[in-house]
Amino acid sequence: MEVNILAFIATALFIIIPTAFLLILYVKTASQSDS
């Protein structure tokens, strides 16, 4: 179970971090285009 939990956390971070990075870039680009 511990290995499965660690694998789940690692996968979640692998997905969440790049997604958050892309969202930040999108928000910055959108705010720049609006202003």
From Swiss-Prot:
Primary localization class, coarse: plastid
Domain of life where this protein originates: Eukaryota
One cellular-component annotation, GO: chloroplast thylakoid membrane
Lineage of source species: Eukaryota, Viridiplantae, Streptophyta, Charophyceae, Charales
InterPro entries in the record: PSII_PsbM, PSII_PsbM_sf
Listed GO biological process terms: photosynthesis, light reaction
Primary role: One of the components of the core complex of photosystem II (PSII). PSII is a light-driven water:plastoquinone oxidoreductase that uses light energy to abstract electrons from H(2)O, generating O(2) and a proton gradient subsequently used for ATP formation. It consists of a core antenna complex that captures photons, and an electron transfer chain that converts photonic excitation into a charge separation. This subunit is found at the monomer-monomer interface.
Disulfide bonds: none
Family per record: Belongs to the PsbM family.
Membrane-spanning segments: 5-25
Name of the protein described by the UniProt record: Photosystem II reaction center protein M
Assembly and binders: PSII is composed of 1 copy each of membrane proteins PsbA, PsbB, PsbC, PsbD, PsbE, PsbF, PsbH, PsbI, PsbJ, PsbK, PsbL, PsbM, PsbT, PsbX, PsbY, PsbZ, Psb30/Ycf12, at least 3 peripheral proteins of the oxygen-evolving complex and a large number of cofactors. It forms dimeric complexes.
Subcellular location field: Plastid, Chloroplast thylakoid membrane
Keyword vocabulary terms for this entry: Chloroplast, Membrane, Photosynthesis, Photosystem II, Plastid, Reaction center, Thylakoid, Transmembrane, Transmembrane helix
Pfam families for the chain: PsbM
Family matches, as PANTHER family: PHOTOSYSTEM II REACTION CENTER PROTEIN M
Topology in the lipid bilayer: Single-pass membrane protein
